[in-house]
Amino acid sequence: QYDHKIFIAGNHDRMFEDFPEKSMEIVRSYKWIDYLQDDWIKVGDDTQMVKIYGSPWQPEFHHWAFNLPRQGEELAAKWAAIPTDTDILVTHGPAQGHLDTSGPPYNEPNLGCPLLRNHIDTAETKPKIHVCGHIHGGSGYKFDGTTHWFNVSILNEYYEYVNKPVTFDWDPITNEITFVKFTDNE
């Protein structure tokens, strides 16, 4: 149904970090899937191209995959590598202050990455859409007038499937979104 299926790894995808060559061998066997790890792809046609950048990194969180020190230079460098002309940014974790509060029983605010938030806030051209997950209780959507922020976690803090997948149509010229399906807590 879709021309492109793009995904990134996350904190549970240790194979992609520990065995990247084998992981990519498996991914390449699925010709209809594009895996992005600190990389981008352009989709569309000659009249309308959209640049999508994806990255799996996150501030250190337990002993999971793709962890880097929260305020470290290496993590800052990952975000600095995001091209300035990115239309859609896909990261495993949220930017601090954007759909990054955990749900019960934790209820912790601002678990997102402060370095990612700073990078986006100070970018000359901000992404039109930022899609993330990771912080399960932050599942939802908000629009700040420039960027559409999505946390598309489908699990709650107990790893139960409680949120529906998100489906929307997006006009890259007007930056308007029409929801086809969204979570119950929109």
List the predicted regions and their residue ranges.
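Generic preference for hydrophobic/aromatic residues in regular secondary structure cores
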Residues: 32-33, 64-70, 141, 158-159, ...
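Active-site regions of metal-assisted phosphoester/phosphodiester hydrolases
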Residues: 76-79, 88-92, 114, 163-170, ...
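Conserved beta-sheet core of the metallophosphoesterase superfamily
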Residues: 3-7, 24, 96-176
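Residue-level detector of flexible, active-site-proximal loop/helix-junction positions
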Residues: 12, 42, 59, 137, ...
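Residue-level preference for short coil/turn positions at secondary-structure junctions
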Residues: 1-2, 48, 82-85, 126, ...
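Conserved catalytic scaffold of divalent metal-dependent phosphoesterases
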Residues: 7-115, 154
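Short, well-ordered strand-loop elements centered on a beta-strand within folded domains, enriched
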Residues: 52, 148, 174-185
